[in-house]
Amino acid sequence: MKATTIERIEDKLYQNRYLVDTRRPHITVRPHRSPSPSLLALTQICPAKCYEVNEIGQVAIVSDGCLECGTCRVLAEASGDIKWNYPRGGFGVLFKFG
């Protein structure tokens, strides 16, 4: 009997490459004293886990591994919690498979 190998999403994401624009991040989080419900939701729903609650209780982003899927844009841009732009040409995610 042949053993079944389960592929993990982390292994697939590891294959992608990123060219990070350190001078101009494509996503910024609005300064806030306490995070809104939509910002807190981003810590759970971002497929690349780019959002996290920092040591002072604010939601911060590390966009280095961003997949540019737009999930955060749909959830939080209209409320003004984040500002989202496409990365400048040549920067951003470089997908390995497609």
From Swiss-Prot:
Q: Its GO biological process terms?
A: nitrogen fixation
Name the keywords, alphabetized. Answer: Electron transport, Iron, Iron-sulfur, Metal-binding, Nitrogen fixation, Plasmid, Transport
Q: Which domain of life is it from?
A: Bacteria
* GO molecular function list: iron ion binding; iron-sulfur cluster binding
Q: Check the record and name the InterPro entries matching this protein.
A: ETF-QO/FixX_C (IPR007859), Fd_FixX (IPR012206)
Kindly give the SUPFAM superfamilies that the UniProt entry links to this protein: 4Fe-4S ferredoxins
Q: Name one Pfam family in it.
A: Fer4_ETF_QO
Q: Which family does it belong to?
A: To ferredoxins from P.putida and C.tartarivorum, ferredoxin I from A.vinelandii, ferredoxin II from D.desulfuricans.
What is the recorded function of this protein according to its Swiss-Prot or TrEMBL entry?
Could be a 3Fe-4S cluster-containing protein.
Q: What is this protein called?
A: Ferredoxin-like protein
The scientific name of the source species is Rhizobium leguminosarum
